From Swiss-Prot:
It comes from Papio hamadryas (Hamadryas baboon). The active site is at H42, H155. This is a non-secretory ribonuclease. It is a pyrimidine specific nuclease with a slight preference for U. Cytotoxin and helminthotoxin. Possesses a wide variety of biological activities. This is Non-secretory ribonuclease. The lineage of its organism: Eukaryota, Metazoa, Chordata, Craniata, Vertebrata. GO terms for molecular function: lyase activity; nucleic acid binding; ribonuclease A activity. The gene is RNASE2. GO terms for cellular component: extracellular space; lysosome. It is an enzyme of class 4 (lyase). Its EC number is 4.6.1.18. It catalyses: an [RNA] containing cytidine + H2O = an [RNA]-3'-cytidine-3'-phosphate + a 5'-hydroxy-ribonucleotide-3'-[RNA]; an [RNA] containing uridine + H2O = an [RNA]-3'-uridine-3'-phosphate + a 5'-hydroxy-ribonucleotide-3'-[RNA]. Residues 1-27 form the signal peptide.
Length: 160
């Protein structure tokens, strides 16, 4: 007998496992708001070298992220972009909370070249450029985000 695809316990466990893995790849650490996590991932490049800067992000996520872009600008400047006209997000056009930077900024793109199960052994190459960017913005967390920013960036949707 062949098990039914969608009622098989093995298939169900596999599906749930895959969904859990996919969800965890995009999850933020629980101690941060989405705006705080955005700042850690895309603004606060703690080192001029990707391998060192990515260690901070990877330690929170407990894995080596494949790629990441750091905008060499301030959080306040990105918050200002949230005031630009809203547009559909290129990565998900059903969302209309994205905003185009309007000006190019210097950025560093980090690309994983040496993956490892040990986070400290992951190595990255970096590419610098000046590009426009598109961010998704949402209302801030009234308790944990800075009160001067009612709307904050929560996702770097695209660099162009």
């Amino acid at each position: 007998m062949v098990p039914k695809l969608f009622t098989s316990p093995i298939c169900l466990l596999l599906l749930l496992g895959l969904m859990g893995v996919e969800g965890s790849l995009h999850a933020k650490p629980g101690q941060f708001t989405w705006a705080q996590w955005f700042e850690i991932q895309h603004i606060n490049m703690t080192s001029g070298q990707c391998t060192n800067a990515m260690l901070v992000i990877n330690n929170y996520q407990r894995r080596c992220k494949n790629q990441n872009t750091f905008l060499l600008t301030t959080f306040a400047d990105v918050v200002h972009v949230c005031g630009n006209p809203s547009m559909p997000c290129p990565s998900n056009t059903s969302l209309n909370n994205c905003h185009h930077s309007g000006v190019q900024v210097p950025l560093i793109h980090c690309n994983l070249t040496t993956p490892s199960r040990r986070i400290s052994n992951c190595r990255y190459t970096q590419t610098t450029a000046n590009k426009y960017y598109i961010v998704a913005c949402n209302n801030s967390d009234p308790v944990r985000d800075p009160p001067q920013y009612p709307v904050v960036p929560v996702h770097l949707d695209r660099v162009i």
